[in-house]
Amino acid sequence: MIKLGSHVSFKKPNYLAGAAGESINNKANTMMIYLGAPQTTKRVEFELYKKQEYLDFYAKDIPAEDIIVHAPYIINPANPTKAKFSCDFLIQEINRMNYINAKYLVLHPGAYTEFAPQEALDQLVKSLTHILSKTKDVVICIETMAGKGTEIGINFEQISYLINKLNSDRIAICLDTCHLWDAGYNLKDYQSFKDELKKWNLLKHVKVIHLNDSKNELSSHKDRHANIDQGHIGLETLAKFVHDKDFDNIPIILETPYVDNKPIYDVEIQMLLNKKP
């Protein structure tokens, strides 16, 4: 089954119910939310989530297991000086996810800043090991990054290192097509890309996909999302992810720009579903 949706707002007054309703209007069957603004760790109380309204009216079309939560950008669990704050926050975020029964948390792996890249990778392993020990159920999906600044998680070697060191069924991967392209993976040579995933034994660990076109050339390390078929990757390549049997039942999430101050996820979802290989 194809699971295709987008990022939608989780905001007052309807929070979870409002996000699910918006997704269903877009003809989506999965969705991604932030439990607060992406640039902050401020959160509202569980009681405001409108969970019962979601269960009564929307859970049939978008089950809780297909609600993806994205961690905020501003935490850095790979930085030794900021790891404690990041861990404490993520433990609470997973508790909030448990309340709504969401299964997958997408996490930017962080940046090495003034430290060495290997130090940051090892700190991330320590941070995630601690978080796993203090939480239950939720699977943390490490997102592939574009290589902007001092980001880690920018190639399959680093992602494989993290997966193997953590060695947990609660650690997985979120592929981001824009980030992969900007990091240097030529998705247009789709079979070679899949072969590279398999070479590193990562295909089976992919549990979420962010499907975005890119405003930049291959290997730009910029991370600037474009609308579907309006960037350098193109509809033909991006649709292959949607219709790939290896990615059946894996939530595929659009994070594309607004057009004229509004999202066009409904249009993009139909474009992708209609573009069969």
UniProtKB/Swiss-Prot annotation:
Zn(2+) 3 binds at residues 179, 223, 225. It is an enzyme of class 3 (hydrolase). It catalyses: Endonucleolytic cleavage to 5'-phosphooligonucleotide end-products. Binds 3 Zn(2+) ions. SMART domains: AP2Ec (SM00518). GO terms for molecular function: deoxyribonuclease IV (phage-T4-induced) activity; DNA binding; DNA-(apurinic or apyrimidinic site) endonuclease activity; phosphoric diester hydrolase activity; zinc ion binding. Zn(2+) 1 binds at residues 70, 108, 143. Its EC number is 3.1.21.2. Disulfide bonds: none annotated. Pfam families: AP_endonuc_2. Its cofactor is Zn(2+). The keyword Transferase does not apply. GO terms for biological process: base-excision repair. Keywords: DNA damage, DNA repair, Endonuclease, Hydrolase, Metal-binding, Nuclease, Zinc. InterPro entries: AP_endonuc_2, AP_endonuc_F2_Zn_BS, Xyl_isomerase-like_sf, Xyl_isomerase-like_TIM-brl. Zn(2+) 2 binds at residues 143, 176, 210, 255. Belongs to the AP endonuclease 2 family. Endonuclease IV plays a role in DNA repair. It cleaves phosphodiester bonds at apurinic or apyrimidinic (AP) sites, generating a 3'-hydroxyl group and a 5'-terminal sugar phosphate. This is Probable endonuclease 4. It comes from Mycoplasmopsis synoviae (strain 53).
